């Protein structure tokens, strides 16, 4: 039996041209439900959710500051101005409290990589 989150991560990685390089699922309460083994969301999950809810102008993940480029009630896209990548949060579905958090290479196009992550997130409806 395959892991639906790993499948979603693989989909985002492939569709983004290998730009999505870290992936996780968190709850609105800040609980980490799944994360790729190349990063740790536990210290920042609650802060990330607070940033989305408050539409913060910046967010910190793993001691790296990202400036918010776009924020809606269901998503946040932020870029590190020093070139440390792009952070994307997107809600799995409107009735769930589950969110995908992804990190993409600094060379990625923010809008394009957001679409790739959002599509992958939507495949997780009812699965996590």
UniProtKB/Swiss-Prot annotation:
One of its GO terms (molecular function) is actin binding. Coiled coil: none annotated. InterPro entries: PFN, PFN_sf. It is found in: Cytoplasm, Cytoskeleton. Disulfide bonds: none annotated. GO terms for cellular component: cytoplasm; cytoskeleton. Keywords: Cytoplasm, Cytoskeleton. The keyword Cytoplasm applies. Its main location: cytoplasm. It holds the Pfam family Profilin. Transmembrane segments: none annotated. It comes from the Archaea. Has no profilin activity against rabbit actin. Belongs to the Asgard profilin family. This is Thor profilin. The lineage of its organism: Archaea, Promethearchaeati, Candidatus Thorarchaeota.
